């Protein structure tokens, strides 16, 4: 028992530190069929393989979408469970210079969000600029996931209709200047 208590005490500073890290909730949306989308700007991180997910040393932020089933989800879906097979991109636009980049968000796994869609990226302009981020979230193509008869009868021919979600006047400076470790 003493070993467990000692190990737990060693982890407390890690949890306290993680709780103090800034994270920016850009917006939240609930959409059919019972999917919650949380759009976030987070501190860049070491994600492997880094060539595929963005080098921490060459990035300003970690742009992400947490996609989970909510209480309105079809039967069989686990509330809070990850919604797989989404195709998500983010267009990050500097409102002053009109410079923009398109970033594809792919599945990631960490200890705080579990599975989520994200990418480390450089901002298209100064860290202290004002930005618009437009997220495009689409369900999988018909050939990418099988849809059983019961889903087709109760929900429809596809997982998710998708949508475009635009957020303006975003200030990423605190996130861009922060470090995880």
Placement of each model-derived feature along the sequence:
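Sec/Tat signal peptide C-region and signal peptidase I cleavage site
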Residues: 14-19
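Short amphipathic, basic-aromatic surface patches that mediate peripheral association
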Residues: 61-80
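Extended low-complexity, serine/threonine- and proline-enriched intrinsically disordered segments
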Residues: 80-100
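Solvent-exposed serine/threonine-rich low-complexity stretches and specific carbohydrate-binding patches
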Residues: 102-111
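Aromatic sugar-binding surface patches on proteins
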Residues: 111-120
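A short tyrosine-centered beta-strand micro-motif
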Residues: 126-136
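Short acidic/polar inter-strand loop motif in beta-rich domains
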Residues: 137-151
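Compositionally biased low-complexity segments at domain edges in trafficked proteins
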Residues: 163-181
């Amino acid at each position: 028992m003493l070993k467990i208590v000692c190990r737990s005490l060693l982890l407390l500073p890690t949890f306290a530190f993680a709780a103090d890290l800034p994270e920016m909730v850009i917006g939240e949306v609930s959409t059919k069929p019972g999917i919650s989308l949380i759009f976030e700007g987070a501190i860049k991180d070491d994600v492997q393989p880094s060539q595929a997910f963005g080098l921490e040393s060459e990035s300003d932020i970690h742009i992400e979408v947490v996609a989970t089933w909510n209480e309105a989800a079809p039967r069989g879906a686990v509330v809070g469970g990850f919604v797989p097979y989404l195709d998500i991109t983010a267009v990050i636009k500097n409102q002053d210079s009109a410079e923009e980049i398109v970033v594809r968000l792919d599945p990631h796994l960490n200890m705080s969000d579990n599975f989520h869609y994200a990418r480390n990226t450089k901002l298209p302009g100064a860290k202290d600029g004002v930005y618009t981020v437009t997220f495009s979230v689409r369900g999988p193509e018909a050939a990418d996931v099988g849809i059983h008869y019961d889903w087709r009868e109760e929900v429809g021919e596809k997982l998710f209709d998708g949508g475009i979600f635009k957020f303006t006047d975003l200030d990423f400076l605190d996130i861009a200047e922060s470090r995880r470790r």
